[in-house]
Amino acid sequence: MKALSRMSSRSRQFLNFGVTFVSVMLCILILPTRLPGMELLGIGPNWLLIWLVAWSIKRKRTVWGAASMGLVLGFLQDAMTAPHPTHAVSLVVVGVLTVVLQKTWSIPADIVERDPIPIALIVFGMAVVAETVIGLQFFAMGDRALLEIWSYHQRVALCSAILSSLWAPVIYFPLNRLWEMTRNLEKP
């Protein structure tokens, strides 16, 4: 830790970027993985959504920052899956809503750091929002009936929200620890 504290400001910024980049890449790599306990009715957790919520809450980002990160993550997810409907719109909405939620409710940092329940609840709600946005995109494309979209959406939204909220602490707490370490290094 002493060696890290002697790093230059540019090196610390690079370390912070490296932690962010590597954590996003790990979430992308585990996105298609289906291990025991990671699947419910054929649906897995939305790792990028979990990462975006953790990043938006912990880093206290601006609305524009969260929207741009949601856009990037959405395009990365679209590159791995079908681009229509896009995941970018849903992740932009999630990023913006998470920042607005953080700013309007001002959830105390000590509660978020020691208790996984607020993070799990936020991830649950945001997963439902994200799947609803994707369902609305399916409806706007017009190639499916509303009843078909609605019945499928209920199953997908609930399974995704349950799994994502249960797995949220696995992403949030290690990232929180790494971001705290890099933030402490930035303090003089």
Q: What name fits each language-model region?
A:
Residues 1-188:
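Terminal, non-globular segments
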